[in-house]
Every structure is written in structure tokens, then in C-alpha cells.
Amino acid sequence: MASKKFAVKCGNFAVLVDLHILPQGSNKDTSWFSEQKKEEVCLLLKETIDSRVQEYLEVRKQHRPSNAEFTRSNPLSLKGYGFQITAYFLKRGIRLRCIRSTQNAELCVFPDRFVVCVSQLAFSRDLLASQNEDLTERVLHGVSDYFAECAESSLPPSAKLRRNALKEIVKRTETKSSVTSKSQTRRDTVETSSDSVIAEIARRRNDGQASSSPPSESMGQAKDSIKAAESHWGLPVQKLEKVNQTQPEDTSGQQKPHPGERLKTGLLSRSPVCSCESASPCPKQSPRVAKTQQKRRNCSSAEDFDHHGRVSLGSDRLVPREIIVEKSKAVRVLPASELSDPGLLLKQDLAKTTSKEELHVLESLSSRHLMKNNPGQAQQTGLATNTERLSTIQNSPTKKRKKYERGH
């Protein structure tokens, strides 16, 4: 067994260390224990030596017996990286003194000798491979050998607390760095996807303008662009459709009528102007449907004129179609200034229908209509009309004679 002796300074004491190295194999080779391993052994035993010196000083001040700790029967056992340490303190029977000099005037030799035995661990191939992998992983992640599991038992409680605190700091730093990298990656992905969506929409828009594709294909491309934008920005489809939708062109080619003409039509049909506009045929309707609606409007206007004719005559007899035509012509002849006042038009219409000339025309037309339908009734009506005319003619000369006699 090879042995080495050296001293470790702790305060005002120099602790002598007897280092015994167990050889490897049968040839008693101790070359495996290098100077680097010697420094590592000193670092592992430094705290144990300091605690023993402090205990010695306290026992000497208090004059009490020392605790039997780390004796030959109860040694200290530590594990380093690839070696095993067994250490204990041994009382020395001879008191030694240091040679004092100007630099070490107060230095004293510690009364206990520290005996350390170092032996190499028997590594198997699997254990060596696993340790190499752990070492490689620690080097890649930037972890020092200070956090190695093999040094767990060699550290005192205070060193373990410091190591745990350092481990917690390292974990927090790794968590923050991972979160930052993930957020940056997600942001880059979102920016890339947004740029691709915008470029795709612009390309489809340019293709739609340049090509002479039918409207159905362009609408399909617009819908695809809308869906892509919706999936990226979370916008509803209806809003995008309102933005992208183009207003349809007016293919009817019909111009809106003049306000005066609309008022004429409203007065003839006795309905508001908006109803005439709503009744106009839609450009999408077929010509047959438009003709049917026009016939219905003509029939309704004819019925309205029939009703007003009966009111103006004060009877329920039917009014022929010629009267309706004459009345419609009379209304259309009115100037535009009178058309602006519907009440004035109604008053003039009623006044004209109650005049004597229109009464004679209506009676003559009604008599013709009755002769076609019922000849007997027409004769009676004609006799009554002739009688009234004769009475009027006979009364008129007598009135003139009376006025003439009064004047003379």
C-alpha cells in the first residue's frame, strides 16, 4: 500500500493527513491515483476537517470531553468520481510542534492525525457506459460535476443545501428559456402563416382579374379566400362576404318614371305611388307573368272607375268602359302644376262628373248600353228622358215671357 503524507491548514492549526492508496490488480499498481484525484480528495474532506477543528476549540474552552466521532470503529465513508474514501481521526501519543517562522508564528499542529484510505471502484462495462452517457449529457447541457450523483454522499448538509438551491436556480432558468423559445417559434409560425394567407389571397385576386373565368368560378375562389382568412384571423364569414361581395348590375335597363307620371298612375288606380312601383314587374319575371299582372292592374283600375262613376251618378247602374276611357283622358290632360295637388284633382274630377253635359253624355251612353243588353228597359228609359227634355223646353219659353213682361 502506497502512502503519502501532507498537511491541510485550517485556521491556526495544521492537520496532518496520512493518505493510503490501495493498489489495483496483483502488480500493486497505484498509477491510477493522479494529482487531480488528490486535489479532489482534499476538497471532499475539507469541510469535515474544519468541523473537527471547531469542535476541538469549543471542547477546550468549555473543559468538557470530546465526542467520539469518525474513529477507526466508526469511520467516514465517501464516494468520489471513480474511487472510494474511508477516513477517521486517530489520537497521536507524541505532541508535535511546528517550526515557527515569521510567516507562521501562531501555527500549531493539530493533536489528531487524519488517516485516509483511497480505493478504486470496480467498474463493469455497463456501469462505465452509463456513466459515460451521463457525463456526456451533463457536458451537453452545461451541468458541472458538482451536481453528479456520485458526489451526493460526500457532501455535508450545508453543501447539500447549497447544491439544492443551485439546482432549483438551474431548473428555473431552463424553464424560462424553453418557454421563450416556444413562444418565439409560435410567433414565427403565425407570421409565416399570415404572410402565406395574404399572398395566396392576392394571387387569387390577380388571377381572377386577369383570367376570363365564369362568375361561378370567381365566386368559388372568393369563398376559398374568405375561408382561409377566417381560419387565420377568426373573423366571421358574413362580414368578409359583405366586404368582398360586389353589387349586382342593374340588367333591367328600365328608368324610373317621372314623379308626375307616378302621381297620374296613382290617381287613376286610386292607390299610393309606392304600390304602383311595387307592382312593376321584376326584371327576372317572364313576359307571360308580366302580362298577367298588367291585366290584373287594368281590371282593378276599371273597377275603381266603375265605382266612382256610380257614386257620381247617385245610382248603382253599370257604367260602360267608354266612360272610363273619357275620364282617364280628362285626368291626363291636366297640367303638371295641378298634378302636384291630389285634393284639387279629386275635386275637379267630382265637379266634372256632376256637370249637366256629362250627365247627358252618361245618359246617352247608358241608353245605348241598355239597348244592347235589354231593349224593353231601354225604351222606357228613353221615353222618360224625352219627357224630361220636353218639359224643360216648354218651361224655358214661359220663364222668358215672364221676364219680358216684367221688364215692360
UniProtKB/Swiss-Prot annotation:
InterPro entries: SLX4IP. Coiled coil: none annotated. Residues 173-226, 243-313, 365-408 are annotated as: Disordered. Keywords: Isopeptide bond, Phosphoprotein, Ubl conjugation. Residues 398-408 have a biased composition (Basic residues). The modification Phosphothreonine is found at T392. The modification Phosphoserine is found at S130, S213. PANTHER family: PROTEIN SLX4IP (PTHR28557:SF1). Belongs to the SLX4IP family. Interacts with SLX4/BTBD12; subunit of different structure-specific endonucleases. This is Protein SLX4IP.
